[in-house]
């Protein structure tokens, strides 16, 4: 395979990525941000569908990548203004991103713990809400572009339950992925509009994302990660049993459906060949992200995420809403010798996509 990549290099034109990026998306280059609250659903008008959009003050750039971030709370608590949400969105907006922290539909603790069917429905509704929020930005782009975004570069992430939502949004590709036994989850989708796009509106626009950020999140079934899927970056403590680092019941409660964390997701991602990276906080439990910037591990997670996302960015190339392609995904970054690498400055990078195309870039710093 490395020989094949090397032969491909002979016919590849070089893209020099001067930063228009220029420290954007890496360092906090803006001093402050503006937060705008919107209702992101065009057919559900309630507090569950409120979203705070963070934009850097004084920024004249347009065509900016987006990160949507979702709060934790075990699917029966939490809001968009929790400390980690505010700190994550503020920090990434100061780096030049447009970021958003969103509410989503919740259950009650009694209903959620009483029935695994309710747990499936609650997660599916939350995924539907997040998909609507993604479509909100693409719809806005097509109708005036209020926020100056690149609709081709949208990342989804969150902490705990928020990470669970992001992972299920990205990696459940088809209704047939969902189990039919012992609970027929495919039939439960009728509760959220009849298909995976859900019932929260903004229809007619893509809900695809270009990467997933998981802070202590997990998947119910890691086999949903396949070779055509989005890049994954995750950060988790190895002693996490709230969302088990390997696999176990959510919140360590036998009444709750199993979740499989970073210890299972990344071997799967490696096996199927999607771009991924993981920061393991050895000996750490679940709560490291909850206090935001006051915990040094949260700062480390922000920097790790920033470094992972940076090579995925188009750095302000022109974009058209009709150019969105959910079929071309970055699967590997290698150097001139064919070795898989992370982002490096002043060094040729070769980005390998799942459609067989290769792009060479040099990030000039």
Residue ranges and their predicted role:
Residues 93, 230, 235-282:
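Active-site-adjacent alpha-helix of alpha/beta-hydrolase-fold enzymes
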Residues 263-317:
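C-terminal catalytic histidine-bearing segment of alpha/beta-hydrolase fold enzymes
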């Amino acid at each position: 395979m490395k020989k094949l990549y090397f032969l491909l290099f002979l016919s590849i034109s070089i893209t020099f990525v001067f930063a228009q990026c220029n420290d954007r998306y890496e360092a906090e280059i803006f001093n402050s941000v503006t937060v705008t609250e919107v209702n992101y659903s065009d057919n559900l008008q309630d507090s569950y569908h409120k979203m705070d959009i963070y934009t850097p003050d004084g920024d004249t750039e347009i065509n900016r990548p987006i990160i949507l971030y979702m709060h934790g709370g075990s699917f029966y608590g939490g809001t968009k203004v929790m400390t980690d949400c505010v700190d994550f969105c503020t920090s990434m907006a100061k780096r030049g991103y447009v970021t958003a922290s969103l509410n989503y539909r919740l259950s009650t603790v009694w209903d959620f713990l009483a029935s695994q069917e309710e747990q499936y429905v609650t997660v599916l509704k939350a995924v539907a809400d997040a998909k609507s929020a993604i479509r909100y930005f693409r719809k806005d782009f097509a109708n005036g572009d209020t926020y100056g975004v690149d609709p081709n570069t949208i990342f989804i992430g969150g902490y705990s339950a928020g990470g669970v939502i992001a992972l299920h949004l990205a990696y459940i590709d088809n209704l047939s992925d969902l189990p039919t036994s012992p609970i027929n989850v495919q039939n439960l989708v009728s509760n959220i509009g009849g298909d995976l796009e859900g019932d929260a509106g903004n229809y007619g626009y893509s809900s695809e994302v270009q990467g997933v950020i998981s802070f202590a999140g997990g998947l119910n079934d890691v086999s949903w990660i396949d070779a055509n899927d989005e890049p994954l970056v995750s950060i988790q403590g190895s002693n996490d049993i709230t969302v088990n680092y390997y696999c176990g019941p959510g919140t360590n409660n036998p009444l709750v459906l199993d979740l499989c964390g970073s210890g299972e997701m990344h071997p799967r991602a490696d096996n199927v060949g999607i771009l991924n990276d993981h920061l393991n906080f050895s000996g750490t439990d679940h709560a490291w992200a909850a206090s935001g910037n006051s915990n040094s591990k949260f700062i480390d997670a922000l920097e790790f995420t920033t470094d992972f996302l940076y090579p995925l960015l188009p750095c302000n190339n022109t974009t058209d809403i009709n150019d969105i392609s959910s079929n071309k995904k970055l699967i590997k970054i290698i150097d001139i010798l064919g070795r898989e690498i992370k982002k490096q400055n002043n060094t040729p990078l070769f980005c390998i996509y799942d459609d067989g195309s290769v792009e060479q870039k040099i990030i000039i710093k």
